Amino acid sequence: MQFMTISNDNKIVLSIPMLSTLSLNCLVKITGSISQSKQLLVENNLLLSNFEIIYNNLVSIKRQIIYKDIFDKMFSYKLRKHPISLNSFYKDNIFYLKGMYLANLFSDKVSKNINSKCIFGMNSISDIIINMRTQKITHRNPKVLCKKINKLNKYTVDEVVEKGEIFEQSVNYIIIKDKYHPEFFVKIKFETNYIYDFFDIECLEYSCNIGDKDLKVIPKITNPNLSVGKVIDNCRNKKFRILSIGKPIIKHDCTNIIVDENGYVSGSMKNCIDRYSCYGNYILRKYRKLINDGWQCLNEVCDNPVCILAQEDFAEKMYKLRKSYDESVPQLEEVNE
């Protein structure tokens, strides 16, 4: 299909009878960016109502291409043997998948035999964590990957460090952008510290040898209080459990109170997590995102209005009541979709 022609008065005429992802991709190559493409469509009264859908589809395709390149580089990557005293603990050439990425794999009913195509063809690709762990030398891996990606001469790579949502720990990211169209980029997180898992579906971990391209997904469970079979079943049915002190407690016992020697209540509801605490805020926001994505929570509603499992309208009503006489009560952060 020809998109550009010369009119009788020697003017360039843009002709797009039907805008599709392929058409937009060609237009981006002509104009140099999506923003300029959109501007050109507006000027020629060709901007369609479904432009955003086509735009998102193109971005998704471009992201998958970038992740595919990363995946192939990780598989061709060979760690150098370091002369350190931790040889007995040294894990060489190991590729890790964990957390919500594995949960999404199972929820989408992916075949047991997976490869780079099905791994990086998922809508939930932003959840991936590539963790090339070699015990205490983990921090060197982002630089190695950056060097490998730079050799492709297709992308620009930036390293960034951001403050984590909980524990205020530092989180390492690399941002990989298309060299010629920086609007297409991916952001990968490298975990260097262990973060406590608050959801059972995040407790799956899978590792394989980098040289093995036939990945057989037989994950292990990182929480001894959970059954790997039960967690996988939950993932396949898009269900999850919120953990209390690492345990899958479905119903909180709200009569479980602690009374001191003078008859005063000194503690209560040990299974509850304060929705206004740093941890509770994080869990609640992630819980809401899972619900919005079509997951179902298996925990029962808690009668404690401060608990993350409290009925939303009841918790909100009690919050307003507390706020009316105590201005120090913290506000929950908005959910970032």
From Swiss-Prot:
InterPro entries: DUF5769 (IPR043908). Belongs to the mimivirus R69 family. This is Uncharacterized protein L685.
